[in-house]
Amino acid sequence: MGLFGKTQEKPPKELVNEWSLKIRKEMRVVDRQIRDIQREEEKVKRSVKDAAKKGQKDVCVVLAKEMIRSRKAVSKLYASKAHMNSVLMGMKNQLAVLRVAGSLQKSTEVMKAMQSLVKIPEIRATMRELSKEMMKAGIIEEMLEDTFESMDDQEEMEEAAEMEIDRILFEITAGALGKAPSKVTDALPEPEPSGAMAASDEEEEEEEALEAMQSRLATLRS
């Protein structure tokens, strides 16, 4: 605390170093998120192969859509890392300018990167806080409120393109999925009454496993 109870402003160099540390910390968070999604995707691939062997093309299609969503999420996370690297480079430039001019300077590159980063759900809280600190320090201009509020992914896939689904399934099953029926029941013989209950129980367990996998992926992407 300074005189009259006012908080003393931190030196510009200290601010820049703090921002850089926070950015690097968030990059580690993003790296961890990417690894988690990719690990879950490997489980989905195994499930697709199992479902394809059983002739459950409808299950395969659902899982393929989850994989498409996950890959899009990973792609966006990699893009966010690129933006964070841009901010880190901007911080290095600020330190260089500080040594020469004695003060921080406005940066359009940092501004553009931060505008993208505040929209990423996984890191939005920290990026929003950093943006406000950078605005106060004069590095970036005040962001419009709708920049902060437009957090929802407008490009969320409602229905994956059939071509993309086919490509994913072909990739995982090495082209064998074309032999699978369009519905699970197409591949099933007429069951004996005693076996019907067992088949029903197995399908119910598989459905629960599918829902659990979808839930885990959705949680990782949120």
UniProtKB/Swiss-Prot annotation:
Bias-annotated ranges (Acidic residues): 200-210
Transmembrane spans: none
GO biological process terms, semicolon-separated: autophagosome maturation; late endosome to lysosome transport; midbody abscission; mitotic metaphase chromosome alignment; multivesicular body sorting pathway; nuclear membrane reassembly; plasma membrane repair; protein transport
Source taxon at top rank: Eukaryota
Stretches for region Important for autoinhibitory function: 59-64, 168-169
Region (Disordered): 180-222
Residue segments, region Interaction with VPS4A: 151-222
Lipid anchor positions (N-myristoyl glycine): G2
Short motif (MIT-interacting motif): ranges: 201-211
Membrane topology, record value: Lipid-anchor
The UniProt record lists the keyword Cell wall biogenesis/degradation: no
Keywords, comma-separated and alphabetical: Cell cycle, Cell division, Coiled coil, Cytoplasm, Endosome, Isopeptide bond, Lipoprotein, Membrane, Myristate, Phosphoprotein, Protein transport, Transport, Ubl conjugation
Region (Interaction with STAMBP): 196-222, 203-207, 221-222
GO CC, any one term: kinetochore
UniProt note: domains: The acidic C-terminus and the basic N-termminus are thought to render the protein in a closed, soluble and inactive conformation through an autoinhibitory intramolecular interaction. The open and active conformation, which enables membrane binding and oligomerization, is achieved by interaction with other cellular binding partners, probably including other ESCRT components.
Database matches in PANTHER family: CHARGED MULTIVESICULAR BODY PROTEIN (PTHR10476)
Function: Probable core component of the endosomal sorting required for transport complex III (ESCRT-III) which is involved in multivesicular bodies (MVBs) formation and sorting of endosomal cargo proteins into MVBs. MVBs contain intraluminal vesicles (ILVs) that are generated by invagination and scission from the limiting membrane of the endosome and mostly are delivered to lysosomes enabling degradation of membrane proteins, such as stimulated growth factor receptors, lysosomal enzymes and lipids. The MVB pathway appears to require the sequential function of ESCRT-O, -I,-II and -III complexes.
Family: Belongs to the SNF7 family.
Oligomer and partners: Probable core component of the endosomal sorting required for transport complex III (ESCRT-III). ESCRT-III components are thought to multimerize to form a flat lattice on the perimeter membrane of the endosome. Several assembly forms of ESCRT-III may exist that interact and act sequentially. Forms a metastable monomer in solution; its core structure (without part of the putative autoinhibitory C-terminal acidic region) oligomerizes into a flat lattice via two different dimerization interfaces.
Annotated protein name in UniProt: Charged multivesicular body protein 3
Origin organism lineage: Eukaryota, Metazoa, Chordata, Craniata, Vertebrata
